[in-house]
């Protein structure tokens, strides 16, 4: 799962709690990372680049990391499989990208192997 990961109190914690609320215990079986940590905020192009990262993960079996993450907020569930600082090889069967834009625009796209 590619999340925005903007390191804002209004973004990261509520999103991770919402994801955990929807997926229940299955949330611990998935990788969660933010490619925005590598690209910065690309404004209108952010969603497209994050979607391409998901397609790359599906195609190459590599989950991109959230880089430069040293200290996690204590509110973050320590059992989450956050892909921090180092990419992980994994058989990725589906990938989801959450995109939250300025002004309240929200979208989620899901890609899967056929």
Label each region the model flagged:
Residues 1-114:
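Conserved "HGTGT" condensation-loop signature of ketosynthase/thiolase-family condensing enzymes
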């Amino acid at each position: 799962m590619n999340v925005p990961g903007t390191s804002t109190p209004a973004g990261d914690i509520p999103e991770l709690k919402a994801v955990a609320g929807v997926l229940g215990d299955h949330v611990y079986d998935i990788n969660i990372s933010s490619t925005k940590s590598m690209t910065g905020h690309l404004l209108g192009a952010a969603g497209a680049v994050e979607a391409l990262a998901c397609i790359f993960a599906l195609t190459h079996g590599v989950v991109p990391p959230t880089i430069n993450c040293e200290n996690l907020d204590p509110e973050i569930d320590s059992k989450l499989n956050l892909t921090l600082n180092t990419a992980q090889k994994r058989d990725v069967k589906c990938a989801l990208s959450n995109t939250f834009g300025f002004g309240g625009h929200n979208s989620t796209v899901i890609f899967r192997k056929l």
